């Protein structure tokens, strides 16, 4: 709660006319187990003046290696699974995630960004990055992951949401 707590979140949301939010799991500690989900649900109910819909991580500790327990967590009120701004880089892991998500009908949310193409960069490639003298993240870093995931969805159809797009070219995919 050092960056934000349920009261500050509620106040900000309500001042903008928002009555419901999805909480992201990239907290400290991350939301990747039943006890953390229970805590978030209970705290949201008791402290927030808005509806809090929690999400949990796709992988334990958001490290991209071991899937969290989708079945158990979804029964506790999780509305979707995401590793927040950490993209699942490994196609085999993503295929297993999608396969399991399809079986139990849970939402997978993915931030599309190829790590190798975005490493050590902090801004989209373009006029502003050039003017500031910064190495930009090329749009292809986003497109590669989107194309990969859309291909995987053909084999493992699940509910899937692409989060935080930064390029209009990605929408065209």
PLM ranges: what are they?
Residues 33-39, 62, 143-145:
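Short amphipathic alpha-helical surface micro-motifs
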Residues 16, 50, 76:
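Structured loop/turn residues at beta-strand edges in well-structured enzyme cores
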Residues 20-23, 49-53, 124-134:
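Gly-rich Lys/Arg/Thr-decorated short loops/hinges at beta-loop-alpha junctions or inter-strand turns
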Residues 34-55, 99-110:
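Alpha-helix-loop-beta-strand connector modules within alpha/beta enzyme cores
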Residues 1-4, 25-27, 53-66, 85, ...:
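Active-site mouth loops of central-metabolism enzymes
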Residues 67-173:
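Histidine/acidic residue-rich metal-binding segments in metalloenzymes
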Residues 1-47:
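Metal-associated gating/positioning segment near the N- to mid-region
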Residues 32, 62-65, 89-90:
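Secondary-structure boundary/capping motif
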